[in-house]
UniProtKB/Swiss-Prot annotation:
Residues 219-228, 291-349, 372-385, 486-497, 514-524, 548-559, 714-735, 757-767, 798-815, 892-915, 1098-1112, 1131-1175, 1194-1216, 1237-1320 have a biased composition (Basic and acidic residues). It comes from the Eukaryota. The modification Phosphotyrosine is found at residue 512. Found in a mRNA splicing-dependent exon junction complex (EJC). Component of the heterotrimeric ASAP (apoptosis- and splicing-associated protein) complexes consisting of RNPS1, SAP18 and different isoforms of ACIN1; the association of SAP18 seems to require a preformed RNPS1:ACIN1 complex. Interacts with API5. Interacts with SRPK2 in a phosphorylation-dependent manner. Ubiquitous. The Ser-1180 phosphorylated form (by SRPK2) is highly expressed and phosphorylated in patients with myeloid hematologic malignancies. Residues 1210-1237 are annotated as: Sufficient for interaction with RNPS1 and SAP18 and formation of the ASAP complex. This is Apoptotic chromatin condensation inducer in the nucleus. The modification N6,N6,N6-trimethyllysine is found at residue 654. One of its GO terms (molecular function) is RNA binding. GO terms for biological process: apoptotic chromosome condensation; erythrocyte differentiation; mRNA processing; negative regulation of mRNA splicing, via spliceosome; positive regulation of apoptotic process; positive regulation of monocyte differentiation; RNA splicing.
Length: 1341
């Protein structure tokens, strides 16, 4: 196929070379390691691997494909299905179908293994060379190419249709990482993993590889998704894969998976398992991302179609032809020693990148920018990566989308694009280097590099350039690597590298010890390749940084476009917003795929770091074309590699730990980190925000990794820091310096972990680098190559950066060791002197907050401005000081930290420095190691405290240039640390104690009168008396008899032989944290003898002062510590107390004897409860104590008597001692006693009778009285009733009267009425009688 279908992966050639290593690399899994193992196994591949006898032999063997050494026919159906599932292939069908399917996949994998990266870009041509015997594969590849072309055309059409929709959706996805941080870990990892796929540039192979591992876990769901994503990837990747149906792609992926599976099985390291998990997650996420990418790719494909049609996605064969040419050319260049060519190619690439960037910048429309970038990057990548056109096309489009911001950032940042391209390519190339070292396949390496870089169009272009440049580097390295290639081929080296890779990821989890073990192996393997590893580490650093920086730039471009990107960035962000939406989702997926890559890169990172070192060394060696460009590209590639390593570390964490939020924060941080890189133009606060999430995430991840590889990686990180600051350091430093106040604490942690986003990038780069650097730096101490690059980087950075940025880098460096406190001690143990470098340089990047250490510690360092001079001075210092320099840096940071904590706690930070005890440092490392570890811990704890004094940090920054000051301080601290060293040097007893962590610069003035008795309160367990006394004995000679500590070890009274010792102890211990887990700060104050005597039980009453205080005077803030005894206010009380003291002294001694006897069987906790209980219960402590003292005296007397008795206790003794009345032990009564008792009983009975009678009489009387009362009550009731009856009668009478009156009134009224009626009648009759006679008369008349 094209480079085995992986050509599409920028690791296509790498995929071929690495046998899916590209995929593996893309998947960011241990694939690199897996394929490295394979590559190592593979003999040096001639420029045409196809001609490789082993390849042809293996290809011939493809007919007899074996899985894990077993013929497919011999495998069970379940095994076949599992293998198919791993490869994401269909598991349905008869066994013969399964065997066929798996065979095809394995053959493809073998092809990928053996296809030469530099061979003609056409897989067919390669196959013709490699597999002229295998006509099946030829047909297969031809078919795939045809299908890929058709699909690409189709997808280009679809992409054109979906472009707008996807652009809109991608606009929403503009900050996929930012979003990713908000998304569930799966989504985040999926987002990252698509990027990983892109970065793998074997979208499918990476997915298929990740699917190999992932399918087994999430095979079924992921399969479909992967297949859909693979279909998309295949469409994009079928240009590179030779247009093959999804199954064919799966088959191809299956080979890659088989390769990976085999390599994994060969390596079968935990890393691989972790990587597999990560890949599974990546695959899951890639599937989602692939779908997203498909939509993104659709527009990208559309654009790519527009541009890629111009480059007709450069027919795979043409692209392959171009690539083979490019690769063969690159290989030739590499063989020539490519550095000179590198600079030329870098110039060309920078010109191309600049032209592309200018085009992009000129092109306001995202599509135009994307198209131009895609065209240029596709042209470059298709020429150099034609094997990976499909995904490369998509990747290029996405990368171009991403690269638009990246290029814009790189344009703004200057030639970084070229170097970024180169650098971005170098990460693959470094892998190739490692691969080439493993298998001096220099030619393939460029192709692989190119293929790996596709995720970023700029990265693609850069990878083309870088691949060429890398080819040159590889050429330069190839001579070096060729010998070491053989060594690398040697399983030992394979194991170290591969193991280092897994370990890097695992150590990301915290397998420091494993990494130490592997680091030695890496060192061993690295030692065979010291120069190469370093160079490779440099190349890888550059490459990864370039890759990371493109992704960072993408992210930065996204953020910057969203934040304060310049007009170019804004245009690009506008253009890129759609393209970034696609490309940011894709680039987020890329960067995430990079992060898987970075995990893969981490697995490869040792090699990469070495290659970075090589690239850096070359960058420094070729400062002409590279110093600034190289440094920038290195910083870019490192930032990218950091983002990868961050996302990778986060991915590995995700897969390894539920720290998905870290990943999201990591991916988000990555997004922010790029912003920081591009936010050089953006506001510093965004950087702070960026830095904090990143650095915290990356700090955790990078702290782990950085701790593993912190030493070498620190150097690389410093280079990266310098290089990266070139991009964003001027503004970043300014921004961060401006930011520190606002985000001082957050950034301090970040700055401590990585003073800047750069430092965090550095951390991540360091993670990758550290992984490499564990090998590389181990070699470095020999070669010190990274160190010169660091000065060069510093120079470049100094050119590009303001001094503040340099100081920030110094902070990073100095804080880097802090970041890796634990790592440092680990490194110190494993690496010794190199540990110094990593401590100084890498210690900080991955530094995790120690238990009990303030989080602010890590956050506040960014405020320190590191000047270029200071960086230069620090770097040279670090080089000579290896161990101490780390100490110096740590101490510089420590001083800052202590200052911060001092501001916070108001306590003496210097003491912390001196007092901080590094449990980690328990191992007897050179003073440097101990001091470093201790300082690291101190720093951790001081950092929270020292963080507040960000301004002092600035002064410290100023001091950083003269690290000697910090060294002096730190060394002094180191001395104190050594003095405090975990082993009691005085006693010779190896008591491991933590050095107290100074919280304040200067202890607050004592409350009590200075005396030789020191009262230390706020003690919090866990610690042992021996540890406490060891701590106290550091500053003076304890009077053992006068030492008192309460039962719960919350406070103690220490009596020193002299007041000076007491003063020294208070100065050393006041306001420090000890043990480190103590959430409180120790309060050391002077106490009076009375106070001590009282607590020792010699005084019944508290000192009068204490009493008065208890009565009304507020006691000091430390209630446990009695207020420093002042001369008793009342002489009488004093006398009384003295008498009591004398009495209680004796009583106390007796009590102590009793206690010792009693408490032998008592548990400490119970004893504490028993003794402390009464105090806590009673309100009046004085009363309680007095009573207790008395009761204790009595008890002690009784107990003493009991003690006098023979040990064999008689029943009588036991009985007499019992307080209860045990019936069992009543002795029989004598007759007299019986008589007496009988008489007593009779008397008692009589008395009882009398009492009964009396009681009865009384009761009778009572009853009579009660009856009397009852009678009276009855009478009363009767009387009341009578009264009430009388009243009722009277009322009735009255009512009757009233009724009679009423009746009478009525009668009267009636009578009157009748009378009226009568009168009226009479009147009428009279009037009639009168009138009638008149009539009669008249009538008569």
């Amino acid at each position: 196929m094209w480079r085995r279908k992986h050509p599409r992966t920028s690791g296509g050639t790498r995929g071929v070379l690495s046998g899916n290593r590209g995929v593996e690399y893309g998947s960011g899994r241990g694939h690199l390691g897996t394929f490295e193992g394979r590559w190592r196994k593979l003999p040096k591949m001639p420029e045409a691997v196809g001609t490789d006898p082993s390849t042809s032999r293996k290809m011939a063997e493809l007919e007899e494909v074996t899985l894990d050494g077993k013929p497919l026919q011999a495998l069970r159906v379940t095994d076949l299905k599992a293998a198919l599932e791993q490869r994401g292939l269909a598991k349905s069908g008869q066994k013969s179908a399964l065997v066929k399917r798996l065979k095809g996949a394995l053959m493809l994998e073998n092809l990928q293994k053996h296809s030469t990266p530099h061979a003609a870009f056409q897989p067919n041509s390669q196959i013709g060379e490699e597999m002229s015997q295998n006509s099946f594969i030829k047909q297969y590849l031809e078919k795939q190419q045809e299908l890929l072309r058709q699909r690409l055309e189709r997808e280009a059409r679809e992409a054109a249709e979906l472009e707008e929709a996807s652009a809109e959706s991608e606009d929403e996805m503009i900050h996929p990482e930012g979003v990713a941080s908000l998304l569930p870990p799966d989504f985040q990892s999926s987002l990252e993993r698509p990027e990983l796929e892109l970065s793998r540039h074997s979208p499918r192979k990476s997915s298929s590889i990740s699917e190999e591992k992932g399918d087994s876990d999430d095979e079924k769901p992921r399969k479909g998704e992967r297949r859909s994503s693979r279909v998309r990837q295949a469409r994009a990747a079928k240009l590179s894969e030779g247009s093959q149906p999804a199954e064919e792609e799966e088959d191809q992926e299956t080979p890659s998976r088989n390769l990976r599976v085999r390599a994994d099985r060969n390596l079968k390291t935990e890393e691989e398992e972790e990587e597999e998990e990560e890949e599974e997650e990546d695959d899951e996420e890639e599937e989602g991302d692939d779908e997203g990418q498909k939509s993104r790719e659709a527009p990208i494909l559309k654009e790519f179609k527009e541009e890629g049609e111009e480059i007709p996605r450069v027919k795979p064969e043409e692209m392959m032809d171009e690539r083979p040419k490019t690769r063969s050319q690159e290989q030739e260049v590499l063989e020539r020693g490519g550095r000179f060519t590198r600079s030329q190619e870098e110039a060309r690439k920078s010109h191309l990148a600049r032209q592309q960037q200018e085009k992009e910048m000129k092109t306001t429309s995202p599509l135009e920018e994307e198209e131009r970038e895609i065209k240029s990057s596709q042209g470059l990548k298709e020429k150099s990566k034609s094997p990976s056109p499909p995904r490369l096309t998509e990747d290029r489009k996405k990368a171009s989308l991403v690269a638009l911001p990246e290029q814009t950032a790189s344009e703004e940042e200057t030639p970084p694009p070229l170097l970024t391209k180169e650098a971005s390519s170098p990460p693959p190339h470094p892998q190739l280097h490692s691969e080439e070292e493993i298998e001096p396949m220099e030619g393939p390496a460029p192709a692989v590099l190119i293929q790996l870089s596709p995720p970023n169009t700029d990265a693609d272009t850069r990878e083309l350039l870088v691949s060429q440049h890398t080819v040159q580097l590889v050429g330069g390295l190839s001579p070096l690597s060729s010998p070491s290639d053989t060594k690398a081929e040697s399983p030992a080296e394979k194991v170290p590298e591969e193991s280092v890779l897994p370990l890097v990821q695992k150590s990301t989890l915290a397998d420091y010890s494993a990494q130490k073990d592997l680091e030695p192996e890496s060192d061993r393997s690295a030692q065979p390749l010291p120069l190469k590893i370093e160079e490779l580490a440099l190349a890888k650093g550059i490459t990864e940084e370039c890759l990371k920086q493109p992704s960072l730039e993408q992210k930065e471009g996204r953020r910057a476009s969203h934040t304060l990107l310049p007009s170019h960035r804004l245009k690009q962000s506008a253009d890129s917003s759609s393209s970034r939406s696609s490309s940011s989702s894709s680039s987020s997926s890329r960067s995430r795929s990079r992060s898987p890559d970075s995990s893969g890169s981490r697995s490869h990172s040792p090699l990469r770091s070495k290659q970075r070192d090589v690239a850096q060394a070359r960058t420094h060696a070729n400062p002409r074309g590279r110093p600034k460009m190289g440094s920038r590209s290195t910083s870019e590639s490192r930032s990218r590699s950091r983002s990868r390593s961050r996302s990778a570390s986060s991915n590995s964490r995700k897969s390894l730990s539920p720290g998905v939020s870290r990943d999201s924060s990591t991916s988000y941080t990555e997004t922010k980190d790029p912003s920081s890189g591009q936010e050089v133009a953006t506001p510093p606060v965004p950087q702070l925000q960026v830095c904090e999430p990143k650095e915290r995430t990356s700090t955790s991840s990078s702290s782990v990794q950085a701790r593993r590889l912190s030493q070498p990686e620190s150097a690389e990180k410093h280079v990266t820091q310098r290089l990266q600051p070139e991009r964003g350091s001027p503004k970043k430093c300014e921004a961060e310096e401006a930011e520190p106040p606002a985000a001082t604490q957050p950034q301090t942690s970040e700055t401590q972990t990585s003073h800047l986003p750069e430092s965090e990038r550095i951390h991540h780069t360091v993670e990758e680098k550290e992984e490499v650097t564990m090998d590389t730096s181990e070699n470095r101490p020999e070669n010190d190559v990274p160190e010169p690059p660091m000065p060069i980087a510093d120079q470049v950075s100094n050119d590009d950066r303001p001094e503040g940025s340099v100081e920030d880098e110094e902070k990073k460096e100095s804080s880097l060791p802090k970041s890796f406190k634990r790592k440092i001690s680990v490194v110190s143990a494993t690496k010794g002197v190199p540990a110094g470098n990593s401590d100084t340089e890498g210690g900080q990047p991955g530094r995790k907050r120690r238990w009990g250490a303030s989080t602010a510690t890590t956050q506040k360092k960014p405020s320190i401005s590191i000047t270029t001079e200071s960086l230069k001075s620090l770097i040279p210092d670090i080089k000579p000081l290896a161990g101490q320099e780390a100490v110096v840096d740590l101490h510089a940071d420590d001083s800052r930290i202590s200052e911060d904590e001092t501001e916070r706690n108001g306590d003496d930070g210097t003491h912390d420095k001196g007092l901080k005890i590094c449990r980690t440092v328990t191992q007897v490392v050179p003073a440097e190691g101990q001091e470093n570890g201790q300082r690291e811990e101190e720093e951790e704890e001081k950092e929270p405290e020292a963080e507040p004094p960000v301004p002092p940090q600035v002064s410290v920054e100023v001091a950083l240039p003269p690290p000697a000051e910090h060294e002096v301080k730190k060394v002094t601290l180191g001395d104190t640390l050594t003095r405090r060293s975990i082993s009691q040097q005085k006693s010779g007893v190896s008591i491991t104690i933590d050095d107290p962590v100074r919280t304040a610069q200067v202890p607050s003035p004592p409350r009590g009168k200075i005396s030789n008795i020191v009262h230390i309160s706020n003690l919090v367990r866990p610690f042992t008396l021996g540890q406490l006394k060891e701590l106290l004995g550091r500053t003076g000679t304890l009077v053992e008899e006068a030492f008192w500590i309460d039962k719960i070890k919350s406070h103690c009274f220490v009596t020193y032989s002299t007041v000076e010792e007491a003063v020294a102890t208070r100065t050393a211990l006041h306001g420090v944290k000890w043990p480190q887990s103590n959430p409180k700060f120790l309060c050391a104050d002077y106490a009076e003898q009375d106070e001590l005597d009282y607590h020792r039980g010699l005084l019944v009453d508290r000192p009068s002062e204490t009493k008065t205080e208890e009565q009304g005077i507020p006691r000091p803030l430390h209630p446990p510590p009695p207020p420093p005894v002042q001369p008793p206010q009342h002489p009488r009380a004093e006398q009384r107390e003295q008498e009591r003291a004398v009495r209680e002294q004796w009583a106390e001694r007796e009590r102590e004897m009793e206690r010792r006897e009693r408490t032998r069987s008592e548990r400490e906790w119970d004893r504490d409860k028993v003794r402390e209980g009464p105090r806590s219960r009673s309100r009046s402590r004085d009363r309680r104590r007095k009573e207790r003292a008395k009761s204790k005296e009595k008890k002690s007397e009784k107990k003493e008597k009991a003690q006098e008795e023979p040990p064999a206790k008689l029943l009588d003794d036991l009985f007499r001692k019992t307080k209860a009345a045990p019936c069992i032990y009543w002795l029989p009564l004598t007759d007299s006693q019986i008589v007496q008792k009988e008489a007593e009983r009779a008397e008692r009975a009589k008395e009882r009778e009398k009492r009964r009678k009396e009681q009865e009489e009384e009761e009778q009387k009572e009853r009579e009285k009660e009856a009397e009362r009852e009678r009276n009550r009855q009478l009363e009731r009767e009387k009341r009733r009578e009264h009430s009856r009388e009243r009722d009668r009277e009322r009735e009478r009255e009512r009757e009267r009233d009724r009679g009156d009423r009746d009478r009134d009525r009668e009267r009224d009636r009578e009157r009425g009748r009378e009226r009626d009568r009168r009226d009648t009479k009147r009428h009759s009279r009037s009639r009688s009168r009138s009638t006679p008149v009539r009669d008369r008249g009538g008569r008349r």
